[in-house]
UniProtKB/Swiss-Prot annotation:
One of its GO terms (cellular component) is ribosome. GO terms for molecular function: rRNA binding; structural constituent of ribosome. It comes from Vibrio atlanticus (strain LGP32) (Vibrio splendidus (strain Mel32)). This is Large ribosomal subunit protein bL20. Binds directly to 23S ribosomal RNA and is necessary for the in vitro assembly process of the 50S ribosomal subunit. It is not involved in the protein synthesizing functions of that subunit. InterPro entries: Ribosomal_bL20 (IPR005813), RIBOSOMAL_L20_CS (IPR049946), Ribosomal_protein_bL20_C (IPR035566). PANTHER family: 39S RIBOSOMAL PROTEIN L20 (PTHR10986). Keywords: Ribonucleoprotein, Ribosomal protein, RNA-binding, rRNA-binding.
Length: 117
């Protein structure tokens, strides 16, 4: 059985990890063993937070819609219920955008929701 030397592969693997760790503080960007742990943990955080981002944006949209609809005299849940009954299908992202940037149009939506309750 011939001897297998894996220096080239190991060097390439180490370079890849250290490249990913570029910009990290101290040994995390220089020492392979520490950098590997840091990069692995960063990947776990990234995976988790890609999912959390969707939840957080939905929470933000709901908070904005709730604030704007209460300014027009209607709670969030009654507003959404009114829109569903009026068969107005606008998602929360767009509703939040309208609430922030076009208050007059949002007021019209609130009136339509009130009318359909």
């Amino acid at each position: 059985m011939p001897r297998v030397k894996r220096g080239v592969q190991a060097r390439a693997r180490h370079k890849k990890v250290l490249k990913q760790a570029k910009g990290y503080y101290g040994a995390r960007s220089r020492v392979y063993r520490v950098a590997f742990q840091a990069v692995t943990k960063a990947g776990q955080y990234a995976y988790r937070d890609r999912r959390n981002k969707k939840r957080q944006f939905r929470q933000l949209w709901i908070a904005r819609i709730n604030a704007a609809s209460r300014q027009n005299g209607l709670s969030y849940s009654r507003f959404i219920n009114g829109l569903k009954k009026a068969s107005i299908e606008i998602d929360r992202k767009i509703l939040a955008d309208i609430a922030v940037f076009d208050k007059a149009a949002f007021a019209v939506l609130v009136e339509k929701a009130k009318a359909s309750l």
